[in-house]
């Protein structure tokens, strides 16, 4: 018998109703987006402007408000491809290692003689010893600083390779440690870029690693690529160093272990600093814009426990000495230590504007990029172009939908109309699922929807053609409908599973636009199996139970 149990009917109707309700906010995109932005602003600040209150009132709070996010090509925005300078991290590792090496080798001075650091290529640390004949002993002692690499691919290897070349001990990062360092650096860079972009209030950015040392950044809705570069391109590397001396000579001699940096405010003034910082921005727990004693914009900061201890110990032992605050290779402040600073907090003053102080605090809170970046590609897509893309995509979708509906009704009559209703519900499922999972719609994604519109009725074509064959062979209408669904099922499942797997491979191996196409196609395929089989079958069962026709025309 042509029957569907009550609970199955309720489940099918419930899923269809849920999809239509969840997808509905996308029909009022601007209104719902304004409502969501106002709610988000209220959650952050606890207050709303009159404009935000009006925007919030434009959409009911009880109604669904999940939207499909528009990608860069539909909303407009900025695209950047950045290269991370991994070599800087290698150098920083060697610089941080030097004090430990100096300590262990100094303990062997009676045997190996005097030690001194000599210039080294990037990623190496070279220490010259006084007693050339004792190089083997120096290498043996230095190797005690090497530790096992913490990674699956580096099992059995140490982080440093220590060798002797003449009278010089040479430290190098092992290949396993380089790979592990690269992965950590890229992961940290991705996270910090994501924090900075999120802190600026942008919507649904795409931030992902490409290759060994590159990061793809796409932010819809931002004004320009330059604005995005200003937001994420600053390293915001904050360090605190002892000041050894000041000079106006940019070519003043610099001993090994020291560095000469320019003053950010006073042109022509340079500070000779100890290269090893007392504390770094990694020890910061908070940074906020504030004002100094004169009411000028400044930035307050606070260290974590270890940073506060190191900062307090240093200030206690160096009262009356200058102390440099270095940001991105420039000395932004070099105050004299007036007293022991035990609280682990302080203030950065300078000739900041309010906006500069706010931006600096944001960057410091987000954390310092572990290495500098070079932008290899930059592209700005204007909102007008994005709007044109949305319009073109909508036109293509409507034309495709109307053409498919016209063909199905012309070919299969009332049953074609049932398929058209199911097709509309299928599209609603795509938008409902995309909105629920926070997916981003791109121009290729719209192409995936158009493709789904054309292919989702394939299952019904197979079913209807099978029904026609059964009717021609003399079967009753009820039996023809049952056999049409039953005998076409295996072909429908096989075709859709292979298509789904192909789209899944595109999603896994592809990137950017290809993944957008794959996502909408996979959702469309999954929805089409449900709508073409169960939704259409339910409509036919309800119609047949109501009309009880002696014959059916398909």
UniProtKB/Swiss-Prot annotation:
Q: How does it sit in the membrane?
A: Multi-pass membrane protein
Indicate where this protein resides in the cell: Cell inner membrane
Key words, A-Z: Cell inner membrane, Cell membrane, Membrane, Protein transport, Translocation, Transmembrane, Transmembrane helix, Transport
Where do transmembrane segments lie in this chain?
10-30, 392-412, 414-434, 435-455, 491-511, 516-536
Report which superkingdom the organism of origin falls in: Bacteria
Q: What is its main location?
A: membrane
Give the CC-aspect GO terms.
Answer: plasma membrane
Q: How does it assemble?
A: Forms a complex with SecF. Part of the essential Sec protein translocation apparatus which comprises SecA, SecYEG and auxiliary proteins SecDF-YajC and YidC.
Identification of the protein by name: Protein translocase subunit SecD
Highest lineage ranks of the organism?
Bacteria, Pseudomonadati, Pseudomonadota, Alphaproteobacteria, Rhodobacterales
């Amino acid at each position: 018998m042509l029957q569907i149990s009550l609970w199955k009917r309720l489940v099918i109707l419930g899923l269809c109703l849920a999809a239509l309700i969840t997808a509905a906010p996308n029909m009022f995109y601007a209104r719902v987006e304004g409502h969501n932005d106002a709610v988000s602003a209220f959650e952050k600040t606890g207050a709303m402007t009159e404009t935000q209150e009006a925007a919030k009132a434009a959409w009911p709070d009880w109604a669904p408000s999940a939207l499909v996010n528009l990608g860069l090509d539909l909303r407009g925005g900025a695209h950047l491809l950045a290269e991370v300078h991994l070599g800087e991290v290698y150098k920083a590792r060697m610089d941080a290692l030097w004090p430990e090496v100096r300590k262990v080798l100094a303990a062997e001075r009676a045997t190996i003689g005097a030690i001194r650091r000599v210039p080294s290529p990037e990623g190496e640390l070279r220490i010259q010893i006084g007693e050339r004949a004792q190089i083997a002993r120096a290498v043996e002692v230095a190797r005690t600083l090497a530790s096992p690499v913490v990674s699956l691919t580096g099992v059995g290897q140490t982080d440093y390779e220590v060798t002797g070349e003449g009278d010089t001990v040479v430290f190098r990062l092992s290949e396993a440690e380089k790979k592990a360092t690269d992965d950590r650096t890229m992961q940290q860079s991705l996270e910090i870029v994501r924090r900075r972009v999120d802190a600026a209030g942008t919507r649904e950015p795409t931030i992902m690693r490409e290759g060994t040392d590159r990061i793809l950044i796409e932010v819809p809705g931002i004004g320009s690529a330059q604005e995005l570069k200003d937001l994420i391109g600053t390293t915001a590397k904050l360090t605190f160093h002892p000041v050894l001396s000041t000079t106006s000579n940019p070519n003043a001699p610099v001993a090994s272990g020291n560095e000469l940096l320019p003053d950010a405010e006073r042109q022509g003034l340079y500070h000779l600093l100890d290269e090893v910082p007392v504390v770094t921005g990694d020890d910061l727990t908070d940074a906020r814009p504030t004002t100094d004693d004169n009411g000028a914009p400044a930035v307050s900061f606070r260290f974590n426990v270890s940073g506060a201890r190191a900062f307090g110990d240093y200030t206690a032992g160096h009262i009356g000495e200058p102390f440099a605050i270095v940001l991105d290779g420039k000395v932004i402040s070099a105050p004299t230590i007036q007293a022991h600073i035990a609280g682990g907090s302080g203030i950065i003053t300078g000739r900041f504007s309010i906006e500069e102080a706010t931006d600096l605090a944001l960057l410091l809170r987000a954390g310092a990029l572990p290495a500098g970046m070079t932008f290899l590609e930059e592209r700005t897509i204007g909102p007008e172009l994005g709007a044109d893309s949305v319009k073109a995509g909508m036109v293509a979708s409507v034309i495709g939908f109307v053409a498919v509906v016209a063909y199905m009704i012309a070919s299969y009559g009332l049953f074609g109309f049932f398929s058209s209703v199911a097709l509309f519900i299928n599209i609603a499922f795509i938008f409902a699922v995309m909105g629920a999972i926070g997916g981003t719609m791109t121009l290729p994604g719209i192409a995936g929807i158009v493709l789904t519109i054309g292919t989702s009725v394939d299952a019904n074509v197979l079913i209807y053609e099978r029904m026609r064959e059964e009717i021609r062979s003399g079967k009753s209408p009820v039996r023809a409908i049952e056999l049409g669904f039953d005998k076409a099922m295996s072909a429908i499942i096989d075709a859709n599973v292979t298509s789904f797997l192909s789209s899944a491979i595109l999603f896994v191996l592809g990137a950017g636009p290809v993944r957008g196409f794959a996502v909408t196609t996979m959702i469309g395929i999954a929805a089409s199996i449900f709508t073409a089989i169960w939704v259409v079958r339910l409509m036919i069962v309800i119609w047949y139970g109501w009309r009880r026709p002696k014959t059916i025309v398909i």
